[in-house]
Amino acid sequence: MNDTLTSDVTGRRVEVNGEHATVRFSGIVPPVAELHPWHMDVPRLGVELKLQLSACITAHVPGLWLGVEWDNPERGKHDGSHEGTVYFKCRHPTGGSFIRPNKVNFGVDFLTAIKNRYVLEDEPEEEEKEQTVIIGNKPVETIGFDSVVKQQSQLSKLQEVSLRNCAVNGAGDKRGIAQVCPNIRSIDLSKNLLSSWDDVIAIADQLKHLEVLNLSENKLRFPSGLPSPTGTFSMLKVLVLNRTGVTWAEVLRCASGWPVLEKLYLESNNIIISERPADVLQTVKLLDLSSNQLIDENQLFLIAYLPRLEQLILSDIGISSLHFPDAGIGCKTAMFPSLQYLVLNDNQISQWSFINELDKLQSLHALSCARNPLTEEGSKDAQTTRQFIIAKIGQLRTLNKCVIQPEERRGAELDYRKAFGNEWKKAGGHQDPDKDRPNEEFLAAHPRYQSLCLSSTNGFFFSWIESMTVQKVKGFLSRLLKVSVSELLLSYESPKMPGREIELENDQQSLQFYSIENGDCLLVRW
Protein backbone atom coordinates (compact mmCIF):
# COMPACT_ATOMS: atom_id res chain seq x y z
CA MET A 1 0.00 0.00 0.00
CA ASN A 2 1.40 3.40 -0.98
CA ASP A 3 1.57 6.35 1.37
CA THR A 4 -1.22 7.96 -0.67
CA LEU A 5 -4.54 6.89 0.81
CA THR A 6 -8.17 7.70 0.16
CA SER A 7 -10.09 9.70 2.72
CA ASP A 8 -12.30 6.75 3.72
CA VAL A 9 -9.47 4.67 5.16
CA THR A 10 -10.56 5.32 8.76
CA GLY A 11 -12.67 2.43 9.98
CA ARG A 12 -11.20 -0.03 7.48
CA ARG A 13 -10.05 -3.42 8.66
CA VAL A 14 -6.42 -4.32 7.97
CA GLU A 15 -3.95 -7.14 8.45
CA VAL A 16 -0.31 -6.70 9.47
CA ASN A 17 1.94 -9.75 9.70
CA GLY A 18 -1.00 -12.01 10.49
CA GLU A 19 -2.53 -9.70 13.12
CA HIS A 20 -5.85 -7.93 12.50
CA ALA A 21 -6.63 -4.33 13.40
CA THR A 22 -8.97 -1.43 12.66
CA VAL A 23 -7.70 1.87 11.25
CA ARG A 24 -8.66 4.66 13.66
CA PHE A 25 -6.50 7.50 12.26
CA SER A 26 -4.53 8.52 9.17
CA GLY A 27 -2.33 11.59 8.94
CA ILE A 28 0.94 13.24 9.92
CA VAL A 29 2.44 12.38 13.30
CA PRO A 30 5.66 13.72 14.89
CA PRO A 31 8.62 11.29 15.11
CA VAL A 32 7.39 7.82 16.07
CA ALA A 33 9.48 4.83 17.04
CA GLU A 34 9.37 1.99 14.52
CA LEU A 35 10.42 -1.57 15.27
CA HIS A 36 13.13 -2.85 12.89
CA PRO A 37 15.30 -5.97 12.90
CA TRP A 38 19.03 -5.33 12.75
CA HIS A 39 22.04 -7.58 12.25
CA MET A 40 25.49 -7.65 13.79
CA ASP A 41 28.39 -9.68 12.44
CA VAL A 42 30.69 -10.98 15.16
CA PRO A 43 33.99 -12.51 13.96
CA ARG A 44 35.28 -15.06 16.44
CA LEU A 45 37.98 -17.70 15.87
CA GLY A 46 37.63 -17.37 12.14
CA VAL A 47 33.87 -18.09 12.23
CA GLU A 48 31.38 -15.37 11.30
CA LEU A 49 28.31 -15.44 13.55
CA LYS A 50 25.21 -13.49 12.50
CA LEU A 51 22.91 -12.42 15.33
CA GLN A 52 19.48 -11.04 14.56
CA LEU A 53 18.17 -8.84 17.34
CA SER A 54 15.00 -6.80 17.70
CA ALA A 55 15.43 -3.17 18.58
CA CYS A 56 13.45 0.02 18.40
CA ILE A 57 15.03 2.57 16.07
CA THR A 58 13.58 6.04 16.37
CA ALA A 59 14.43 7.14 12.87
CA HIS A 60 11.46 9.10 11.53
CA VAL A 61 10.93 10.21 7.99
CA PRO A 62 8.08 12.73 7.60
CA GLY A 63 5.00 11.30 5.90
CA LEU A 64 1.68 9.59 6.40
CA TRP A 65 0.98 7.26 9.31
CA LEU A 66 -1.91 5.00 10.17
CA GLY A 67 -3.12 4.73 13.74
CA VAL A 68 -4.55 1.24 14.29
CA GLU A 69 -6.35 -0.48 17.14
CA TRP A 70 -5.33 -4.13 17.33
CA ASP A 71 -7.80 -6.96 17.92
CA ASN A 72 -5.13 -8.35 20.25
CA PRO A 73 -4.32 -5.44 22.60
CA GLU A 74 -1.01 -7.06 23.59
CA ARG A 75 0.20 -6.33 20.08
CA GLY A 76 -0.02 -2.55 20.60
CA LYS A 77 2.07 0.04 22.47
CA HIS A 78 -0.25 2.87 23.53
CA ASP A 79 -3.85 4.06 23.75
CA GLY A 80 -3.79 6.18 20.59
CA SER A 81 -1.97 9.19 22.02
CA HIS A 82 1.58 10.37 21.35
CA GLU A 83 3.52 12.97 23.32
CA GLY A 84 0.37 14.30 24.94
CA THR A 85 -1.71 14.49 21.76
CA VAL A 86 -4.67 12.12 21.37
CA TYR A 87 -4.86 10.96 17.76
CA PHE A 88 -7.42 8.20 18.32
CA LYS A 89 -8.92 6.23 21.19
CA CYS A 90 -8.60 2.55 22.08
CA ARG A 91 -10.63 0.35 24.39
CA HIS A 92 -7.38 -0.99 25.89
CA PRO A 93 -4.46 1.16 27.13
CA THR A 94 -1.99 -0.77 24.98
CA GLY A 95 -4.27 -1.49 22.02
CA GLY A 96 -2.88 1.09 19.57
CA SER A 97 0.08 1.55 17.25
CA PHE A 98 1.24 3.87 14.47
CA ILE A 99 2.18 2.03 11.26
CA ARG A 100 3.36 3.06 7.82
CA PRO A 101 0.72 2.44 5.09
CA ASN A 102 3.10 0.28 3.08
CA LYS A 103 3.22 -2.24 5.96
CA VAL A 104 -0.56 -2.74 5.89
CA ASN A 105 -2.68 -5.22 3.94
CA PHE A 106 -6.14 -3.82 3.15
CA GLY A 107 -7.27 -7.13 1.65
CA VAL A 108 -8.98 -8.20 -1.56
CA ASP A 109 -12.54 -8.30 -2.84
CA PHE A 110 -14.75 -11.39 -2.61
CA LEU A 111 -14.28 -12.58 -6.20
CA THR A 112 -10.50 -12.25 -6.05
CA ALA A 113 -10.45 -14.40 -2.92
CA ILE A 114 -12.76 -16.95 -4.56
CA LYS A 115 -10.52 -17.21 -7.61
CA ASN A 116 -7.36 -17.42 -5.53
CA ARG A 117 -8.74 -20.38 -3.62
CA TYR A 118 -10.97 -22.25 -6.05
CA VAL A 119 -9.73 -21.69 -9.61
CA LEU A 120 -7.52 -24.55 -10.70
CA GLU A 121 -4.66 -23.42 -12.90
CA ASP A 122 -4.36 -25.36 -16.16
CA GLU A 123 -1.14 -27.18 -16.96
CA PRO A 124 1.11 -24.89 -19.05
CA GLU A 125 0.94 -25.65 -22.74
CA GLU A 126 3.58 -25.00 -25.34
CA GLU A 127 1.20 -22.82 -27.32
CA GLU A 128 -2.24 -21.47 -26.44
CA LYS A 129 -4.95 -22.24 -29.00
CA GLU A 130 -6.36 -19.34 -30.97
CA GLN A 131 -10.14 -19.17 -31.11
CA THR A 132 -12.81 -16.98 -32.69
CA VAL A 133 -15.82 -15.95 -30.62
CA ILE A 134 -18.72 -13.61 -31.39
CA ILE A 135 -19.09 -10.56 -29.14
CA GLY A 136 -22.04 -8.50 -30.27
CA ASN A 137 -22.02 -8.86 -34.06
CA LYS A 138 -18.25 -8.91 -34.46
CA PRO A 139 -15.94 -11.94 -34.55
CA VAL A 140 -13.04 -11.57 -32.14
CA GLU A 141 -9.90 -13.70 -32.07
CA THR A 142 -8.94 -14.81 -28.55
CA ILE A 143 -6.10 -16.73 -26.98
CA GLY A 144 -6.73 -18.91 -23.93
CA PHE A 145 -10.52 -18.45 -24.08
CA ASP A 146 -11.09 -22.12 -23.24
CA SER A 147 -9.27 -21.61 -19.93
CA VAL A 148 -11.46 -18.63 -18.99
CA VAL A 149 -14.66 -20.53 -19.79
CA LYS A 150 -13.45 -23.50 -17.74
CA GLN A 151 -12.69 -21.28 -14.74
CA GLN A 152 -16.10 -19.62 -14.91
CA SER A 153 -17.73 -23.05 -15.11
CA GLN A 154 -15.87 -24.19 -11.99
CA LEU A 155 -17.01 -21.18 -9.98
CA SER A 156 -20.63 -21.32 -11.13
CA LYS A 157 -20.94 -24.81 -9.63
CA LEU A 158 -19.75 -23.77 -6.18
CA GLN A 159 -22.33 -24.25 -3.42
CA GLU A 160 -20.17 -24.36 -0.28
CA VAL A 161 -17.34 -21.85 0.05
CA SER A 162 -14.72 -21.42 2.77
CA LEU A 163 -12.77 -18.16 2.67
CA ARG A 164 -11.64 -18.08 6.29
CA ASN A 165 -8.69 -15.75 6.84
CA CYS A 166 -8.45 -14.78 3.16
CA ALA A 167 -8.39 -10.99 3.77
CA VAL A 168 -11.78 -10.42 2.10
CA ASN A 169 -12.69 -6.74 2.46
CA GLY A 170 -15.91 -6.45 0.46
CA ALA A 171 -17.97 -7.42 -2.56
CA GLY A 172 -15.95 -5.74 -5.30
CA ASP A 173 -17.75 -5.29 -8.64
CA LYS A 174 -21.42 -4.54 -8.11
CA ARG A 175 -22.86 -7.58 -9.93
CA GLY A 176 -19.71 -9.64 -10.32
CA ILE A 177 -20.56 -12.23 -7.68
CA ALA A 178 -24.03 -12.90 -9.09
CA GLN A 179 -22.54 -13.45 -12.55
CA VAL A 180 -19.62 -15.66 -11.55
CA CYS A 181 -20.83 -17.81 -8.63
CA PRO A 182 -24.60 -17.42 -8.21
CA ASN A 183 -25.25 -20.86 -6.70
CA ILE A 184 -23.42 -20.45 -3.41
CA ARG A 185 -25.50 -21.66 -0.46
CA SER A 186 -22.95 -21.68 2.35
CA ILE A 187 -20.08 -19.25 3.01
CA ASP A 188 -17.45 -19.18 5.74
CA LEU A 189 -16.16 -15.59 5.82
CA SER A 190 -14.74 -15.80 9.33
CA LYS A 191 -11.61 -13.85 10.28
CA ASN A 192 -11.53 -11.55 7.26
CA LEU A 193 -11.33 -7.77 6.80
CA LEU A 194 -15.01 -6.91 6.48
CA SER A 195 -15.66 -3.58 8.22
CA SER A 196 -19.42 -3.20 8.27
CA TRP A 197 -22.78 -4.91 7.91
CA ASP A 198 -23.14 -2.98 4.64
CA ASP A 199 -20.13 -4.93 3.29
CA VAL A 200 -21.94 -8.15 4.18
CA ILE A 201 -25.16 -7.01 2.52
CA ALA A 202 -23.29 -6.12 -0.68
CA ILE A 203 -22.10 -9.73 -0.90
CA ALA A 204 -25.27 -11.48 0.28
CA ASP A 205 -27.52 -9.40 -1.96
CA GLN A 206 -25.98 -11.17 -4.97
CA LEU A 207 -26.47 -14.68 -3.57
CA LYS A 208 -30.18 -15.47 -3.72
CA HIS A 209 -29.71 -19.06 -2.49
CA LEU A 210 -27.61 -18.23 0.57
CA GLU A 211 -28.60 -20.39 3.57
CA VAL A 212 -25.49 -20.46 5.80
CA LEU A 213 -23.25 -17.47 6.61
CA ASN A 214 -20.33 -17.44 9.05
CA LEU A 215 -18.97 -13.96 9.86
CA SER A 216 -17.09 -14.79 13.07
CA GLU A 217 -14.06 -12.66 14.03
CA ASN A 218 -14.94 -9.78 11.73
CA LYS A 219 -15.20 -6.60 13.80
CA LEU A 220 -18.30 -5.21 12.13
CA ARG A 221 -20.08 -1.87 12.37
CA PHE A 222 -23.80 -2.54 12.45
CA PRO A 223 -26.46 -0.08 11.27
CA SER A 224 -27.96 2.31 13.78
CA GLY A 225 -31.00 3.04 11.66
CA LEU A 226 -32.93 1.06 9.08
CA PRO A 227 -32.89 -2.76 9.11
CA SER A 228 -31.49 -4.97 6.37
CA PRO A 229 -33.09 -4.56 2.95
CA THR A 230 -36.01 -6.92 2.44
CA GLY A 231 -35.03 -10.00 0.45
CA THR A 232 -31.26 -9.92 1.02
CA PHE A 233 -31.35 -12.78 3.52
CA SER A 234 -34.68 -14.31 2.49
CA MET A 235 -33.23 -17.85 2.43
CA LEU A 236 -30.77 -17.54 5.33
CA LYS A 237 -31.17 -20.30 7.94
CA VAL A 238 -27.82 -20.24 9.80
CA LEU A 239 -25.97 -17.07 10.87
CA VAL A 240 -22.74 -17.11 12.89
CA LEU A 241 -21.74 -13.79 14.49
CA ASN A 242 -19.26 -15.00 17.11
CA ARG A 243 -16.72 -12.37 18.22
CA THR A 244 -18.04 -9.67 15.88
CA GLY A 245 -18.78 -7.06 18.55
CA VAL A 246 -22.51 -7.10 17.83
CA THR A 247 -24.86 -5.88 20.58
CA TRP A 248 -28.29 -7.26 21.44
CA ALA A 249 -29.97 -4.08 20.18
CA GLU A 250 -28.16 -4.46 16.85
CA VAL A 251 -29.23 -8.09 16.59
CA LEU A 252 -32.88 -7.15 17.06
CA ARG A 253 -32.55 -4.26 14.61
CA CYS A 254 -31.15 -6.48 11.86
CA ALA A 255 -33.27 -9.55 12.67
CA SER A 256 -36.29 -8.30 10.74
CA GLY A 257 -34.22 -9.06 7.65
CA TRP A 258 -33.82 -12.73 8.64
CA PRO A 259 -37.37 -14.05 8.14
CA VAL A 260 -36.56 -17.79 8.11
CA LEU A 261 -33.48 -17.89 10.36
CA GLU A 262 -33.23 -21.12 12.40
CA LYS A 263 -29.77 -21.01 14.01
CA LEU A 264 -28.09 -17.92 15.46
CA TYR A 265 -24.63 -17.99 17.06
CA LEU A 266 -23.61 -14.96 19.17
CA GLU A 267 -20.69 -16.25 21.23
CA SER A 268 -18.20 -13.86 22.89
CA ASN A 269 -19.75 -10.47 22.12
CA ASN A 270 -20.16 -8.98 25.63
CA ILE A 271 -23.90 -9.10 24.97
CA ILE A 272 -26.37 -7.85 27.55
CA ILE A 273 -29.96 -8.86 26.78
CA SER A 274 -31.82 -5.63 27.33
CA GLU A 275 -35.16 -6.15 25.64
CA ARG A 276 -37.56 -8.87 24.60
CA PRO A 277 -37.66 -9.80 20.89
CA ALA A 278 -40.86 -8.40 19.42
CA ASP A 279 -41.90 -9.94 16.11
CA VAL A 280 -38.30 -11.00 15.35
CA LEU A 281 -36.34 -14.23 15.91
CA GLN A 282 -39.66 -16.08 16.03
CA THR A 283 -38.33 -18.82 13.73
CA VAL A 284 -35.07 -19.42 15.63
CA LYS A 285 -34.62 -23.01 16.85
CA LEU A 286 -31.03 -22.75 18.11
CA LEU A 287 -29.51 -19.79 19.96
CA ASP A 288 -25.89 -19.74 21.17
CA LEU A 289 -25.11 -17.05 23.76
CA SER A 290 -21.96 -18.65 25.17
CA SER A 291 -19.23 -16.53 26.76
CA ASN A 292 -21.44 -13.49 27.26
CA GLN A 293 -21.90 -12.28 30.83
CA LEU A 294 -25.56 -13.17 31.39
CA ILE A 295 -25.28 -13.73 35.14
CA ASP A 296 -28.70 -12.25 35.82
CA GLU A 297 -31.43 -14.81 35.11
CA ASN A 298 -33.83 -11.98 34.27
CA GLN A 299 -31.90 -11.44 31.04
CA LEU A 300 -32.69 -15.01 30.03
CA PHE A 301 -36.36 -14.55 30.84
CA LEU A 302 -36.48 -11.90 28.08
CA ILE A 303 -35.92 -14.65 25.50
CA ALA A 304 -38.07 -17.22 27.32
CA TYR A 305 -41.04 -16.92 24.99
CA LEU A 306 -39.38 -17.51 21.63
CA PRO A 307 -41.95 -20.02 20.36
CA ARG A 308 -39.67 -22.35 18.37
CA LEU A 309 -36.51 -22.25 20.47
CA GLU A 310 -35.42 -25.88 20.87
CA GLN A 311 -31.70 -25.56 21.65
CA LEU A 312 -30.14 -22.95 23.94
CA ILE A 313 -26.37 -22.85 24.47
CA LEU A 314 -25.34 -20.92 27.59
CA SER A 315 -21.80 -22.13 28.26
CA ASP A 316 -19.51 -19.82 30.23
CA ILE A 317 -22.04 -17.06 30.96
CA GLY A 318 -21.34 -16.93 34.70
CA ILE A 319 -24.81 -17.99 35.82
CA SER A 320 -25.17 -19.55 39.29
CA SER A 321 -28.87 -19.38 40.16
CA LEU A 322 -32.22 -19.92 38.47
CA HIS A 323 -35.84 -19.65 39.55
CA PHE A 324 -38.94 -19.69 37.38
CA PRO A 325 -41.34 -17.36 39.21
CA ASP A 326 -44.44 -18.64 37.42
CA ALA A 327 -44.14 -22.28 38.57
CA GLY A 328 -44.37 -23.71 42.06
CA ILE A 329 -43.02 -27.01 43.40
CA GLY A 330 -43.87 -29.88 41.08
CA CYS A 331 -45.33 -27.60 38.38
CA LYS A 332 -44.15 -26.73 34.87
CA THR A 333 -43.19 -23.24 33.75
CA ALA A 334 -44.69 -21.54 30.70
CA MET A 335 -41.22 -20.23 29.83
CA PHE A 336 -39.13 -21.85 27.08
CA PRO A 337 -42.09 -23.98 25.94
CA SER A 338 -40.22 -25.73 23.10
CA LEU A 339 -36.77 -26.01 24.70
CA GLN A 340 -35.43 -29.56 24.32
CA TYR A 341 -31.65 -29.18 24.64
CA LEU A 342 -29.89 -26.91 27.14
CA VAL A 343 -26.11 -26.44 27.45
CA LEU A 344 -24.79 -24.99 30.73
CA ASN A 345 -21.14 -26.03 30.65
CA ASP A 346 -18.42 -23.99 32.41
CA ASN A 347 -20.69 -21.96 34.69
CA GLN A 348 -20.94 -21.37 38.45
CA ILE A 349 -23.76 -23.80 39.29
CA SER A 350 -23.16 -25.11 42.81
CA GLN A 351 -26.65 -25.69 44.25
CA TRP A 352 -29.10 -28.52 43.63
CA SER A 353 -31.91 -25.97 43.61
CA PHE A 354 -30.73 -24.98 40.11
CA ILE A 355 -31.22 -28.57 38.89
CA ASN A 356 -34.65 -28.70 40.56
CA GLU A 357 -35.74 -25.70 38.50
CA LEU A 358 -34.76 -27.42 35.25
CA ASP A 359 -37.42 -30.06 35.91
CA LYS A 360 -39.98 -27.29 35.41
CA LEU A 361 -39.07 -27.00 31.71
CA GLN A 362 -41.87 -28.86 30.00
CA SER A 363 -39.98 -30.06 26.90
CA LEU A 364 -36.42 -30.51 28.19
CA HIS A 365 -34.94 -33.85 27.07
CA ALA A 366 -31.18 -33.21 26.88
CA LEU A 367 -28.82 -31.35 29.23
CA SER A 368 -25.09 -30.64 29.29
CA CYS A 369 -23.74 -29.15 32.51
CA ALA A 370 -20.09 -30.21 32.65
CA ARG A 371 -17.40 -28.29 34.52
CA ASN A 372 -19.61 -26.65 37.13
CA PRO A 373 -18.80 -26.66 40.88
CA LEU A 374 -21.75 -29.01 41.41
CA THR A 375 -20.56 -31.51 38.82
CA GLU A 376 -16.80 -31.24 39.15
CA GLU A 377 -15.11 -34.53 39.85
CA GLY A 378 -13.78 -34.40 43.37
CA SER A 379 -16.63 -32.26 44.70
CA LYS A 380 -18.70 -35.43 44.88
CA ASP A 381 -18.66 -38.85 43.34
CA ALA A 382 -19.27 -38.19 39.63
CA GLN A 383 -21.56 -41.17 39.19
CA THR A 384 -23.68 -40.21 42.20
CA THR A 385 -24.00 -36.67 40.88
CA ARG A 386 -25.14 -38.01 37.53
CA GLN A 387 -27.70 -40.25 39.25
CA PHE A 388 -29.13 -37.37 41.27
CA ILE A 389 -29.48 -35.14 38.19
CA ILE A 390 -31.30 -37.94 36.36
CA ALA A 391 -33.61 -38.51 39.33
CA LYS A 392 -34.36 -34.80 39.73
CA ILE A 393 -35.23 -34.17 36.06
CA GLY A 394 -37.90 -36.70 35.21
CA GLN A 395 -38.12 -36.26 31.44
CA LEU A 396 -34.36 -36.14 30.77
CA ARG A 397 -33.16 -38.58 28.10
CA THR A 398 -29.57 -37.42 27.54
CA LEU A 399 -27.10 -36.04 30.09
CA ASN A 400 -23.72 -34.63 29.05
CA LYS A 401 -24.12 -36.26 25.63
CA CYS A 402 -24.67 -39.73 27.12
CA VAL A 403 -28.06 -41.37 26.52
CA ILE A 404 -29.95 -42.31 29.69
CA GLN A 405 -31.08 -45.90 29.28
CA PRO A 406 -34.28 -47.04 31.09
CA GLU A 407 -32.21 -49.25 33.36
CA GLU A 408 -29.99 -46.33 34.35
CA ARG A 409 -33.01 -44.17 35.17
CA ARG A 410 -34.61 -46.88 37.31
CA GLY A 411 -31.36 -47.38 39.22
CA ALA A 412 -30.80 -43.63 39.63
CA GLU A 413 -34.28 -43.01 41.00
CA LEU A 414 -34.07 -45.99 43.36
CA ASP A 415 -30.67 -44.89 44.72
CA TYR A 416 -31.96 -41.33 45.11
CA ARG A 417 -34.95 -42.56 47.14
CA LYS A 418 -32.67 -44.62 49.36
CA ALA A 419 -30.20 -41.76 49.84
CA PHE A 420 -32.87 -39.40 51.19
CA GLY A 421 -35.33 -41.88 52.69
CA ASN A 422 -34.45 -41.16 56.31
CA GLU A 423 -34.52 -37.42 55.68
CA TRP A 424 -37.97 -37.81 54.10
CA LYS A 425 -39.30 -39.65 57.16
CA LYS A 426 -37.83 -37.09 59.56
CA ALA A 427 -39.47 -34.33 57.51
CA GLY A 428 -42.89 -35.97 57.94
CA GLY A 429 -42.99 -38.40 55.05
CA HIS A 430 -44.96 -41.63 55.51
CA GLN A 431 -46.01 -44.58 53.36
CA ASP A 432 -49.60 -44.17 54.53
CA PRO A 433 -51.10 -41.36 52.41
CA ASP A 434 -53.19 -40.19 55.35
CA LYS A 435 -50.05 -39.64 57.41
CA ASP A 436 -47.77 -38.45 54.62
CA ARG A 437 -47.01 -34.80 55.42
CA PRO A 438 -43.41 -33.89 54.44
CA ASN A 439 -42.59 -30.30 55.33
CA GLU A 440 -42.15 -27.50 52.79
CA GLU A 441 -38.39 -27.42 53.27
CA PHE A 442 -38.05 -31.04 52.18
CA LEU A 443 -40.42 -30.60 49.23
CA ALA A 444 -38.46 -27.56 48.06
CA ALA A 445 -35.17 -29.48 48.21
CA HIS A 446 -36.61 -32.65 46.64
CA PRO A 447 -39.60 -31.70 44.43
CA ARG A 448 -39.80 -35.09 42.70
CA TYR A 449 -39.38 -37.28 45.77
CA GLN A 450 -43.10 -37.73 46.39
CA SER A 451 -43.78 -38.83 42.82
CA LEU A 452 -40.81 -41.22 42.95
CA CYS A 453 -42.34 -42.84 46.02
CA LEU A 454 -45.35 -43.72 43.87
CA SER A 455 -43.42 -45.42 41.10
CA SER A 456 -41.48 -48.64 40.75
CA THR A 457 -39.90 -50.39 37.81
CA ASN A 458 -43.19 -50.91 35.98
CA GLY A 459 -45.70 -48.07 36.03
CA PHE A 460 -47.51 -47.12 39.24
CA PHE A 461 -47.25 -49.53 42.16
CA PHE A 462 -48.04 -48.93 45.79
CA SER A 463 -46.29 -50.89 48.49
CA TRP A 464 -49.53 -50.79 50.47
CA ILE A 465 -51.63 -51.68 47.40
CA GLU A 466 -53.74 -54.48 48.83
CA SER A 467 -55.39 -52.36 51.51
CA MET A 468 -55.56 -48.97 49.78
CA THR A 469 -59.00 -47.70 48.78
CA VAL A 470 -59.77 -45.66 45.68
CA GLN A 471 -60.64 -42.74 47.97
CA LYS A 472 -57.18 -42.86 49.60
CA VAL A 473 -55.50 -42.98 46.21
CA LYS A 474 -57.44 -39.90 45.13
CA GLY A 475 -56.52 -38.08 48.34
CA PHE A 476 -52.85 -38.84 47.83
CA LEU A 477 -52.94 -37.74 44.19
CA SER A 478 -54.89 -34.62 45.10
CA ARG A 479 -52.07 -33.45 47.38
CA LEU A 480 -49.40 -34.49 44.92
CA LEU A 481 -50.97 -32.91 41.84
CA LYS A 482 -52.68 -30.01 43.64
CA VAL A 483 -56.04 -30.94 42.08
CA SER A 484 -59.39 -31.25 43.84
CA VAL A 485 -60.41 -34.83 44.72
CA SER A 486 -63.75 -34.31 43.02
CA GLU A 487 -62.01 -33.62 39.70
CA LEU A 488 -59.99 -36.84 39.65
CA LEU A 489 -61.05 -39.82 37.54
CA LEU A 490 -59.12 -43.08 37.96
CA SER A 491 -58.87 -46.12 35.74
CA TYR A 492 -56.25 -48.73 34.93
CA GLU A 493 -54.95 -50.89 32.10
CA SER A 494 -53.51 -54.38 32.43
CA PRO A 495 -51.13 -56.20 30.07
CA LYS A 496 -53.35 -59.22 30.60
CA MET A 497 -56.27 -57.34 28.98
CA PRO A 498 -54.72 -55.30 26.14
CA GLY A 499 -56.92 -52.57 24.72
CA ARG A 500 -59.27 -52.51 27.70
CA GLU A 501 -59.46 -49.70 30.26
CA ILE A 502 -61.18 -50.41 33.60
CA GLU A 503 -62.67 -47.49 35.53
CA LEU A 504 -62.25 -47.33 39.34
CA GLU A 505 -65.75 -46.01 40.02
CA ASN A 506 -66.32 -47.02 43.66
CA ASP A 507 -64.30 -44.83 46.04
CA GLN A 508 -64.89 -47.18 48.99
CA GLN A 509 -63.48 -50.30 47.33
CA SER A 510 -59.82 -51.26 47.68
CA LEU A 511 -57.55 -51.59 44.71
CA GLN A 512 -57.42 -55.30 45.45
CA PHE A 513 -61.15 -55.44 44.65
CA TYR A 514 -60.32 -54.40 41.07
CA SER A 515 -57.53 -57.02 40.85
CA ILE A 516 -54.82 -54.41 40.20
CA GLU A 517 -51.42 -56.11 40.09
CA ASN A 518 -47.79 -55.13 39.84
CA GLY A 519 -47.19 -54.16 36.21
CA ASP A 520 -50.62 -52.60 35.67
CA CYS A 521 -50.82 -48.90 34.74
CA LEU A 522 -52.95 -46.49 36.76
CA LEU A 523 -54.45 -43.71 34.62
CA VAL A 524 -55.29 -40.35 36.20
CA ARG A 525 -57.51 -37.73 34.52
CA TRP A 526 -58.80 -34.37 35.69
Give residue spans per PLM region.
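Long, contiguous C-terminal flanking segments immediately downstream of a protein's structured core
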Residues: 2-9, 17, 92, 101-526
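Short coil-to-beta-strand transition motifs
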Residues: 13-20, 61
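Short beta-strand-centered aromatic/proline hotspots
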Residues: 19-30, 44, 50-58
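Acidic glycine-/aspartate-rich tracts in secreted/extracellular proteins
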Residues: 29, 71-76
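Short, solvent-exposed secondary-structure boundary/capping segments
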Residues: 30-46, 58-67
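Short, acidic/hydrophobic/Gly-rich beta-strand patch recurrent on exposed beta strands
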Residues: 67-69, 491
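A short macromolecule-binding patch
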Residues: 74-102
